[in-house]
Amino acid sequence: MNILLSRILKYLNGTLFLDDAYRFCVFFILHYQDFDSYTIEDISGELQTTPECILKFLKYLGFDNYLSFIEIYQRHKQVRFEQIQERMKNIHVSSYVERIKVSNDNEAFLKKIEEVYTKIHDSKRVILVGALYPMSIAVEFQTDLISFGKTVLQYHTYDKDMIFMKMTMLSLFLHQEDH
């Protein structure tokens, strides 16, 4: 299901412009858990833009108005949470590690996974940096973490505010190895 959050992330991750649409997407991610508590006027004031500029972007996403956007946000937020809950039932990380065979020492590999998990948990936000292909599959990772309240953004060199936000952050570098 191409939920609203993943559509926003696909736009945000792929855009080359620091414009009102980009700022709206970042605002959406930063305030995802309680986004429906904001009016379009609140958001336009915060972003120093107009409601019309926001509505123009929402029309680009296929929405006729802000209310329909909020209704889909609420529905998709609930659906995504239920999807994650269902996926996590009876999951055993060790069995996945056995099947993918990335290491000869599964215990050491599981320990590394736990270290990464702890770093993600302890950070206020996660910034993804990397090549196009690994970034394209990272949208699932982003939607899961954002759904649980963790801010996850892709790094864009043109967004100077991203570098200097005053919060604990973890940067993950994603790359593709040629074999």
Describe these PLM feature segments.
Residues 1-3, 145:
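N-terminal-biased segments
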Residues 121-179:
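Glycine-rich phosphate-binding loops that contact phosphosugars or nucleotide phosphates
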